[in-house]
UniProtKB/Swiss-Prot annotation:
GO cellular component, one term: nucleus
InterPro entries tied to this protein: bHLH_dom, bHLH_transcription_factors, HLH_DNA-bd_sf
Function: May play a role in the specification of the sugar-sensitive adult gustatory neuron and affect the response to sugar and salt. Regulated by POXN.
Residues covered by region (Disordered): 35-59, 102-144, 265-333, 361-398
Entry keyword annotation includes Transcription: yes
Tissue: Expressed in neuronal and glial precursors during differentiation. In the peripheral nervous system, expression is exclusively in one of the neurons that innervate each larval chemosensory organ. Expressed at a late stage in the development of one type of adult chemosensory organ, the gustatory bristles of the leg, wing and proboscis. Expressed very early in the development of a second type of chemosensory receptors, the olfactory organs of the antenna.
Protein name as annotated: Basic helix-loop-helix neural transcription factor TAP
Compartment(s) where it occurs, according to its Swiss-Prot or TrEMBL record: Nucleus
Principal localisation: nucleus
Residue ranges with Polar residues bias: 361-370
Start-end of Basic residues biased regions: 127-141
Keywords from the UniProt entry: Developmental protein, Differentiation, DNA-binding, Neurogenesis, Nucleus, Transcription, Transcription regulation
Biased composition annotated in UniProt, kind: Low complexity: 307-333
Length: 398
């Protein structure tokens, strides 16, 4: 009978075991932990009285463990089994210390092992790309509608912040560019697209000035006005604006570009080089003072003058234009001026009744159109009787 003491119980409890039972042991179980699967013999009762039998060491042939009989453990392993000491003599030592003290000095290095060994990787080998599920194959966690709304709101807030920062940066850059560009006058307000166009035209104009060696006088106000018109400057336009300014027609007269309707100075100095002189146009005369406001076209006055000329086919000889004066466009004809001046004054003094009575009597409308006939109003609505053979009479449908 073996007694087991329980220190946590109030009184001692006794358990009875069969002495013939091989599973029973008189030790504390500490020695049982040193037994391995190599001892396949039936359980035996520990006898601490007899000394242990020394094991015969068998050399390891370098093969597998199958060559060694299963009845005895491998060489050097028997020393780990301590059957001569009990628990009381080794209570202060740990299991690790006991194994280290009883193990042999030999190194266990079998040629074959079941532990996989990772082969060294080639640093130059391309690393395989990770494959992520994209599109329909992507599996996401199921979210509640509240979570979906919160996620969308958060994404929209982040997108709005990014757009706001982008617009702030763009406006700051455009403001710095506007301050750098010359503006005439200084309080001129330019839009964003006008700032960009003016920057392009200004840089292009400076490039052309550098290529010409600084001989071109760049008019910034003219360049700014050209930019505000919405045009993009090119090489040809730059030459027409600053290198060779061309005159433009205005009310039938030719004025040089950039001077508007101001009169030309008679003492204007000639340019240094003949190549830069603009070509002379047909109706423009150098050295003449043109009026500030060119004469407009009076349609009523021109019709009165035409009617007066029709009524006076034979003019005096001194009022007829001289063909020699017409052949020379560079000379001013005083007779032409007097002719038109007197004609307009005479037409203005005519009575309106006399003017309206015969203004178009000589036209083909009055000479080729038959006279009008007055028809009575009662006969205007009479329906004409159709010819008897022209239409077929049908019976009235009820």
């Amino acid at each position: 009978m073996a007694a087991c003491y329980n220190a946590y119980s109030a009184g001692s409890q006794s358990f009875e075991f069969d002495e013939d039972d091989d599973d029973a042991s008189f030790d504390s179980g500490y020695e049982k932990s040193f037994e391995t699967e190599a001892q396949l013999s039936s359980r035996r009762r520990l006898d601490f009285g007899t000394p242990p039998t020394p094991a015969i060491p068998q050399p390891y042939s370098g093969g597998t463990w199958d060559a060694v009989p299963l009845s005895s453990p491998p060489a050097g392993f028997v020393g780990l089994l301590d059957t001569s000491s009990n628990h009381s003599t080794r209570s202060g030592r740990t299991l690790v210390e006991h194994l280290n003290s009883r193990a042999t000095n030999g190194v266990f290095d079998p040629p074959l092992t079941s532990t996989p060994v990772k082969s060294p990787e080639d640093p130059n080998a391309p690393r395989p790309k990770r494959k992520y599920a994209v599109g329909k194959n992507r599996v996401t966690r199921s979210r509640s509608p509240t979570q979906v709304v919160k996620i969308k709101r958060f994404r929209r807030m982040k997108a709005n912040d990014r757009e706001r920062n982008r617009m702030h940066n763009l406006n700051d850059a455009l403001e710095k560019l506007r301050v750098t560009l010359p503006s005439l006058p200084e309080e001129t307000k330019l839009t964003k697209i006008e700032i960009l166009r003016f920057a392009h035209n200004y840089i292009f104009a400076l490039e052309q000035v550098l290529e010409s060696g600084g001989s071109i006088n760049l008019d910034l106000e003219k360049l700014q006005n050209f930019t505000l018109s919405g045009e993009r400057i090119t090489k040809e336009l730059f030459d027409a604006l600053f290198v060779n300014p061309q005159p433009y027609p205005l009310f039938g007269r030719m004025f040089p570009y950039g001077q508007g309707m101001a009169p030309l100075a008679q003492h204007q100095t000639a340019p240094a080089s003949h190549a830069e002189q603009p070509p002379a146009m047909g109706g423009f005369q150098h050295g003449m003072d043109y009026p500030q406001q060119p004469p407009g076209f009076d349609f009523t006055g021109s019709m009165r003058f035409y009617h007066q000329q029709q009524q006076q086919p034979h003019q005096p000889h001194h009022l007829q234009p001289n063909p020699q004066q017409e052949s020379s466009p560079q000379q001013f004809s005083q007779e032409k001026y007097d002719l038109f001046r007197g004609s307009f004054d005479a037409a203005a003094n005519l009575h309106s009744t006399n003017l309206d009575s015969g203004i178009h009597q000589q036209s083909s409308f009055y000479s080729q159109t038959p006279p009008w006939k007055d028809y009575p109003e009662d006969q205007a609505h009479v329906h004409p009787v159709p010819h008897q053979h022209s239409y077929k009479n049908f019976a009235p449908q009820v």
